[in-house]
Structure formats: structure tokens, C-alpha cells
Amino acid sequence: MSLLKMRRHAIHSSDSTSSSSSEDDCFERRTKRNRNRAINRCLPLNFRKDEIRGIYKDRMKIGASLADVDPMQLDTSVRFDSVGGLSSHIAALKEMVVFPLLYPEVFEKFKIQPPRGCLFYGPPGTGKTLVARALANECSRGDKRVAFFMRKGADCLSKWVGESERQLRLLFDQAYQMRPAIIFFDEIDGLAPVRSSRQDQIHSSIVSTLLALMDGLDSRGEIVVIGATNRLDSIDPALRRPGRFDREFLFSLPDKNARKEILKIHTRDWNPKPVDMFLEELAEHCVGYCGADIKSICAEAALCALRRRYPQIYTTSEKLQLDLSSITISAKDFEAALQKIRPASQRAVTSPGQALSAIVKPLLQNTVHRILDALQKVFPHVEVGTNKSLNSDVSCPFLESDLAYSDDDTPSVYENGLSQKENLNFLHLNRNACYQPMSFRPRLLIVGEPGFGQSSHLAPAVIHALEKFTVYTLDIPVLFGISTTSPEEACSQMIREAKRTAPSIVYVPHIHLWWEIVGPTLKATFTTLLQTIPSFAPVLLLATSEKPYSALPEEVQELFTHDYGEIFNVQLPDKEERTKFFEDLILKQASKPPVSQKKAVLQALEVLPVAPPPEPRPLTAEEVKRLEEQEEDTFRELRIFLRNVTHRLAIDKRFRVFTKPVDPDEVPDYVTVIKQPMDLSSVISKIDLHKYLTVKDYLKDIDLICSNALEYNPDRDPGDRLIRHRACALRDTAYAIIKEELDEDFEQLCEEIQESRKKRGCSSSKYAPSYYHVMPKQNSPPVGDKKPDQEQNEKLKVPCTPVACSTPAQLKRKFHKKSKWHVGTKIKRRKISQAKDNSLNAMNSSSRSDTEDSQHTHAEHTEPGNTDESSVEESDKQNRLESNIDLKNNSSSSNIENELEEPKETTEGTELRKDRIVCRGDASASQVTDIPEDSESKEMDFLRMTLARGSQVEQQELISMEQALAILSQPTPSLVLDHKQLTNILKTVVKKSQKYNIFQLENLYAVISQCIYEHRRDYDKTALVQKMEQAVENFNCSRS
């Protein structure tokens, strides 16, 4: 930060006799300098400044990255153990990056090169960037560091022609120089979109440059390129081949085991930790939630717990003291979080998979299990998709494949181990029955009557159980809702993607309506594409129908046959399932007493004390030393600036009369009028003694010079008027110079340093020159009789010595607290001492005093305040001190009182008023004031109580006192309920709903629930039981 606003002029010189060779050299140096400046911006994110040696230290001076650091800043706390449910992806990344560094001998033995490129694709929030950050941190440990470069797709784009390609070349060049290195392109679809004739030529050139850099004639060496996108179809196909992006990793939505691992990661630092059973149940309800959604659920649950325990913090802006141990996260906090957080997968397109709700789970859970058993016979891959296999464990992902990691011995493929047998088969590609499940065109049709829930409950529950598989929905809204593509094109694209991502599921809900609505072209396209799927490809066709199998069209019947168990008929719930369905509602929820709010009200009324401001972290000795050095550098600039201003004022002939202090021998009455003498030489001395920490302190002394001159020199003769004009000019000149040349930020910095030193208790004169403190001891004898005044910090009144020039800074720091009565006290003592010593000099030098006193600058910046506006206590203290002195020096004090008539009258008037008040309080008036004292004391106590309760009233705005008292005063009556009547109602409901379908049962459940809700606050449940009986009796299933 520069102190003065000075202009810097650059001098350019050129030699006209320079040869062409020198010009070429200058051009080459300029070109090299520009290239280095551009390379300086391409530096890895995971290297700190102190870790880069040599030339890289200079490169860090410009910037660490071209990318925006805010959204892409590297979080060093993210490791591979912070990523859950992606063990296979992490293992593949270790093979690409970590293992070639740790085990180079393996790759050297077989002369192989590990994969140098991979592509992450999948929905948003599934952990693509998180895995990249974890990889960067894992590569930043150990001796062999890996430089990690992170770029977003649009970072390399520029409006200048050829600049984007140049930035890419510089990026790869920098990564090659710092190899091994990783380049991560986030949202690469914005950098390398599909090239076409309709596209802009600039994008095509960028894509061509990126293709050549990744796998061109020049080998890129130990540079791993990782791309991430959620739009795989938007990337140029040339990037998706071996040599560029060798591997493609699908980041799908996490399954149940992966969600549980993610929950464990986000709750592992909680105290106490959630139990494993709760996390498993929570993971089961988080269907369709990505990793970012699960993290948001944990954060929202913590906020719900805080909101429930301390609602007071939402009604005040001050920080309150909280008991963190009383904030506990319960299951209902997670329930509230699940209701608030909507999964990312359901914001754009609703996922077809959905678990059975807690209400219908007792009714349909057995049916779902029977469907899964029937599906396992048709589609054996169900076992892989539903079992809790070991591949979810990060420590053993190799157990996933039985074929690759079996203990079976195979024939040797080397020349030294080959036997002499002929016609030996090495590869057994057709022997897969022992290692993986196999099925022939797996298909399943769930049929039933309308209202059996096959499309609304059963099929989504089955898809939810098979959540490891990718699901492609071919319903009517999907086919006809996309305006840019035809239904035939959308159908063919989905089935092709299903074949590519096998094992997968093609889901066709309401196939009876689907087949009636679509045209013959779409029917032919659908059947043809199904036939093109390989016979043993694990692509399941799942469909639902609300018509019997015999009522379906012949083409649909040909797709599903009875002989292979591809038809599942949904049956009505039996008696046991209906009993479980209504049992919890009728027997438990109906008998639940009203919710008590007394605990919540007490928590809302709890008064929380205001938390003290957080104390700053204590600095170490080294940090304190470094901080003091920086502060002293700033104050050194301040002193240089103030000396410059003072010097400019002193050399001005107009202000020569203010450069030296007044001689007391020539002007004896000066110290009796002016309480704080000040001049420019004293200002210089204070600068040398480090008394000025801000420019405001300096300007106070300039104002002091001006006010002293105006006070001592009355506006009577021309000489005094000239001095008064010059004093005002001195003040205006000083202010103008500082206003013009001082930086406002620098003044603010000085004030912050001054405040920081006060808090730390650091002395402002610690670095002051030591010889200044020796001089006053040699000049102290002339003022030896004023030693008591020095004990009271009144060293100010010796104007001819350096002490008088340096001590005002000590007085200025205490000016607002003590200077008033100290100066008032010293007026009398000064008058006494100087009356004895200078009585004759005052008469002899009266003619010279009018001219010589004008050379002084007379202080007391707030002089009238010390006499007219002093407080009662200050005047009383001053009166006592003056009365003691007057007893000893009656004659001399009377002479001095005549010199200061007006200030004395004012002071005495204040003292007399004080004396009158004190006397009346000590006399008979005390009886008159006794009665009001009691009432006033009560009012004061009430006022204190009101002020103390101010924060409480503000906190209690959350709930009114009347409402709180009404809730707390309510008695808790006993619950009146006949359980036998509830049991009879349950039997009646189960018997009456014998032939009800799923929708009718849900309707009856809603009717009973409404009755319970209406009487939820009643302790007498007799009316509830009667209303439930009436509702069950009057229920008509025809409207369902």
C-alpha cells in the first residue's frame, strides 16, 4: 500500500544506432517473455507457493490458475475415504494414476502403458467432481507428487481467434513439464461438443486441437486427462476411443448400500453417532437421492434439530450462548429433512422406481416378494441387483468377478510353459454358466384388474428393488412429450441405450393402453428393436396391464408367454394383510393422546444469555514479532510523511513565529493563560518519540497551536491580528497538504493498528529512540518545586525544556478522562509557583510580552469545557485542592485570581452551586427527600429489571406470554378410551373389506384417518369411536 499519491514517470530511451541483430534479440526476448507470462497462469491447484521451487516460484506470482478459484477451489480434506459407493471407480483411477508411480517395475516388465484418459458421465450430484478432488488430494501426498490441473469447459474459450487453441497447448505443455500430471476438464461438453457442418468453425478448431493434444503425433507422456459431463451424447465421438478417453465411468444414482456408505461418511464425526440400523432404514427411504442430496439431508436434519431446541435464535440478531450437548438429532428431524429436500433426479424427470410407502407396505409387501421370486426365474440377474454383495466394500472390489479371480488353473500361454499337446484351447468364452447368470430374452408382465396397484405400487417397487440396473421408461408421456424427436426415434434411441448399458430394464407401464394409442409404425419399430436384442443379453422387458392376459391384443400376448413364467397375476390382499394394514391406524393411532406442547413452550421461553464476542486466537511469539515489524513499517511511513509536512510548514516564512516555544523569562504570564503550550519543534519531538499513531493525533496538535495563538493574542492591535491570521493559515495549510497527499486507506490502516495495540497492551513507544528519555533529567532543576505536579502527570508546564515538548502526548492519550480536572487543579498551583518566581519579570517585560508571546502556539483544544462545562464531581475535587493551596498562599493567590477573573468566576459559580446542593442534602432537607427515595428506588429497581429483561422480551416474540401461560396452565386430564370398541371396529373393517381392491382399501384408510385427525386434541375419545363406527358403516366402495 503506497502512502503518497505520487506519479511515476517511465523514461523510454532508444538507440538509433542499434543494429538489426540487436532488434532480433529484443524481439526474441519479448516473445519468450510473453510466452512465460502465459505459462505462468497454467499452474496446478494442489501445489502451494512454498512447494514450488526454481522457476515455478516466479510463475506463482501471476496466478495459480486460469479457472475461477471460488467454485473449483481444492478442498484438501477430501480423500478416497470421503467417497462412498464408488469403489470400482476409485480402483480404476488407482490403476491409472497411483500404481504407475508406486509400482513402475510392473509396467516396465510388460512394456505397457496404463490408460491415460477416462470420462466421467452421469446425472448431476453423483460425485464426478468429488472423485476428481479426492484424486488430486491423494496424489498430493508422499514423495512423488502429481500436479493436478483443473479446468472448466468454458475457461479455455476466448473471443480472440486462435487464443483458445493456444491456451490448450500451453496447458498441455505446462503439464508435460511438471509430469506426472492430471488435467481434469469439468463440463467438457462445453469445450468439445459434437462437430457438425452447422457448428461454428471456432468450436471445431478447438475440438481438433484437443484431439491432437490427447493422442496426436507427439506422445503426451505421463499426463492423465479426465473429463466430466452429464451429457454424454453432446461430446464429440472422436474423444471416446482408446488412446484419448480409454475408459468411461458411469456415475449413476447410488443404490441402497452406496447410500448407506454416504450417510456413514457424512455422520461419522457426529457425537454420538447414529446406529447402523437407523442408517440402513434411512438409506432405504432415500430412493432417487444422489450424493449431494444425501449431504443436504444431513445438513437439513441438523438445522431442524437446532430450530427445535433453540427457537429463540431466530428472533434476535445477537449471538446467544447455546448448550451444544442439548442439541440432539432425532428421527423426526430426518423426516422433516426428507420432506423438504427434493431429490435431483425428481426435479426434471420423475424416476419410475419408488419404494412402497409406509402405509401400504403391510398390504403389498408379500406381493412384491412374490413378484421378485417369479422374476428371478426369468431374469437371474435379479440376484446380482438385489443381494448385499461384497463389491460395495472399498477394501475388496476384486471379489466382484468370479471368472477373473478364480483359483482354477488355466494352460500356460508362454513359450517355456507350453505343452506339446495339439489343438489346445486357451480361451473358453462359451463357459459362462459357472461365473455369471444367463437368461433368454427375459420378460415379465404384471396383470390384474383395475385398482390392484400393479402400475402405481407394485411395478415401481420392483424397479426400486432392482435399482442397480438402468431403467428406460417407454410410457406415453415420454414418447409423445418430446417435441424435437418423433416417437419412433425416441423409442429406438432408448432401446439402443438399453443394449449398450446392459444389464438394464425397459419399462412399459399400461401396455394395454400403449398398444391401443400408438400407431403401426411405432409398433413395428418396437417389436423389431426387441428382436434385434441378442438372445442372451440381460435386457429385461417389464410391463404392466390392467386387463387380463386373455383380453390383450395378440401381438402383446406373443411378447409374453405363460410357459416360461412371464405372466404374474396380482391377487387381492388376504385377511392377514388387511389386518396389518388397518391395525396400526385403528388400535395405535386412534388411541394416541394429544400432543403436549409444554416442553416446546418451556424451551421457547428459556432465556439465553448473550454470548460474549469470540476471543481471537492467541498469537505465537513469532507471529507477534512479525506483526510488530509490519506495524512498525507502517508507522515509519507515517512518521516520514508527518516530518515532511512539518518541514514544509516550518520553512514557510509566514509560520516562523510558531517554530519555537515561548521563553517564560520574556513572557511570564503565558503559562497562566495557556495550559498546553505547543509549537512545531515540539511536534517534531513527538514525531521522533513515536507519539503520533494516526494523522488525527497530529492534527490535534496543529489545532492546539492555532487555538493557543487565538486565545493568547486578542484581536486588538495589528500585531496580534497578524499572528491570528497566520495561525489560521497554518491550520488550513496543514489540513490541505494532508487532504491532498494522504491516502485514506493508509489512515484507516493506522487506526486499525492503534486499536490492535490497545487490545494487545503493546506500548506505542517501544521502538522510540532511547536518548530522548535522558535529556529531561538534565533540565529538571528549574522546575524542581513542581515535582508534585509531575507525580500527577502534569509535566506539560515546562515550555523551555524537551520535556514540555514530549509530555503532551501522554496527556493527549488520557485527555478524555483526566485532563479536565488535572488541568483545572494545576491552574492554581501554576499560578502560585510562577507568582513567586516571576512577579518582577511580569512587570518588567510587559512591553515585550505583546510581541514575544505571539511566537507561541497556545493550547487547550477544549479549554472552555474545563471551566464552564465541568461535572459536579470534577469541580468538587478541584475546589478541595484549591482550598488547601489557598490556606498556605493567601497573598500570592489573590494576585493570580485578579489575572484570571473570568475563568475563576465560572469555576467558582459551579463550585458554589455544588456546595449549595451538598449542604441542602446534608441538612434538614434530608427528611423531605426520604419519602421520594423509596418510590424512586422502586422505580429504579423496576427500570433495571426492565432493562435486564429487554433481551428476554425480544426473544419471547416467538410466542406471546398469554399463549404460553395458557398452554402451561392447562391441566393434563386422563385419556378416556374403550379399547374393546376399537378392536371391534378393526374386525368390522377387515370383514367388510374382503373384496376391496387396493384403491378401495386406501380410500377407506383415508376416511378413518380423517376422523382421527379431527379428534386429535380430545382426551375423551368416545366421540371419535362413534364417528369411526359411523364412517365405516356408511362407507361406499362404488366411488372408488
Curated annotation (Swiss-Prot):
Protein name as catalogued: ATPase family AAA domain-containing protein 2
Residue ranges of coiled coil: 619-643, 735-761
PANTHER family in UniProt: AAA DOMAIN-CONTAINING, ATPASE FAMILY AAA DOMAIN-CONTAINING PROTEIN 2
Catalytic activity: ATP + H2O = ADP + phosphate + H(+)
Lineage summary: Eukaryota, Metazoa, Chordata, Craniata, Vertebrata
Keyword Transcription: yes
Gene for this chain: Atad2
Biased composition (Basic residues): 1-11, 811-833
Example of a GO MF term: ATP hydrolysis activity
Subunit structure: Interacts with ESR1 and NCOA3 and these interactions are enhanced by estradiol. Interacts with acetylated lysine residues on histone H1.4, H2A, H2B and H3 (in vitro).
Amino acid composition bias (Basic and acidic residues), ranges on this chain: 784-797, 849-863, 874-885, 901-919
UniProt keyword list: Activator, ATP-binding, Bromodomain, Coiled coil, Hydrolase, Isopeptide bond, Nucleotide-binding, Nucleus, Phosphoprotein, Transcription, Transcription regulation, Ubl conjugation
PROSITE patterns associated with the record: AAA, BROMODOMAIN_2
Residues given in the record as ATP binding sites: G122, P123, P124, G125, T126, G127, K128, T129
Positions of post-translational Phosphoserine modification: S65, S401, S406, S849, S883, S891, S951
Any GO BP annotation: positive regulation of DNA-templated transcription
